[in-house]
Amino acid sequence: MRIVVLAGGIGGARFLRGLKQAAPDADITVIGNTGDDIHLFGLKVCPDLDTVMYTLGGGINEEQGWGRTDETFQVKEELAAYGVGPGWFGLGDRDFATHIVRTQMLGAGYPLSAVTEALCARWQPGVRLLPMSDDRVETHVAVETDGESKAIHFQEYWVKLRASVEAQAIVPVGAEQAKPAPGVLEAIGSADVIVFPPSNPVVSIGTILAVPGIREAIAEAGVPVVGLSPIVGDAPVRGMADKVLAAVGVESTAAAVARHYGSGLLDGWLVDTVDAGAVEEVEAAGIRCRAVPLMMTDVDATAAMARQALELAEEVRA
């Protein structure tokens, strides 16, 4: 079975670990969000791609869900001693090596997709990890601070400000001009199932869908497209998805997120058992819906979620 998964960072990576357990023989292609990418200290940092790579390769800091295990921060401390920032983004010493290799390869003319493949050769994530595009796309957030309207990088909004100010708009800068990375449209076209994990629907999956050709390819793939709600009990399971949903005029409910994706894209939707009351509303929107436990408390629980998603896909197919 060929499965394509659109993934952001922590939520997508943890779901993928469960999916690999649920479908050990499946051929899994991950289309990773690169809208979170940021240039720091002259280096190209790809937080979502790295989180997937480290998580599936066994190198992730399990407690925080991002960054490397057994990490140290001596380079960061030395930079701070020179008065060089930003200090709010936690790049560890081991992590720096990844970004140095990536930046060197990009500078030598390799596209991001080839660089990602080379990095994965070390980590052996057990999936084919593709960036959504080789072109530069950056998600920016329009905010008002100190009476001044300005656009800031998504990482500054999310990590530095902790989404503490209202997001007035979310803009994937460069997405309109970007092309899907090599292999992305081919993977979608040959998939048996396409899955939207419980990643952020606006700044993770939404950014991937903003690259021209990807949304259309999924809608026309002719195979079941199933998603899992990142909203449980009217609140995000983790992160601050409610803040960015509000910016695009979507309520923080499991049903509202399903409608946001729409029946033209989504065939099936899983909501948590606490949101069982939303099933009827989602089905009224033309999307098959089931209520199942959706808390990724451990790999077994996550694998059970993945199995439910694949079962729902088979129901849709039938």
Curated annotation (Swiss-Prot):
Pathway: Cofactor biosynthesis; coenzyme F420 biosynthesis
Superkingdom classification of source: Bacteria
Cofactor(s) needed: Mg(2+)
Coiled coil: none
Enzyme Commission no: 2.7.8.28
Residue sites binding 7,8-didemethyl-8-hydroxy-5-deazariboflavin per the record: 50
Keywords associated with the record: Magnesium, Transferase
One GO BP: F420-0 metabolic process
Known function: Catalyzes the transfer of the phosphoenolpyruvate moiety from enoylpyruvoyl-2-diphospho-5'-guanosine (EPPG) to 7,8-didemethyl-8-hydroxy-5-deazariboflavin (FO) with the formation of dehydro coenzyme F420-0 and GMP.
Similarity comment: Belongs to the CofD family.
Protein name in the entry: Phosphoenolpyruvate transferase
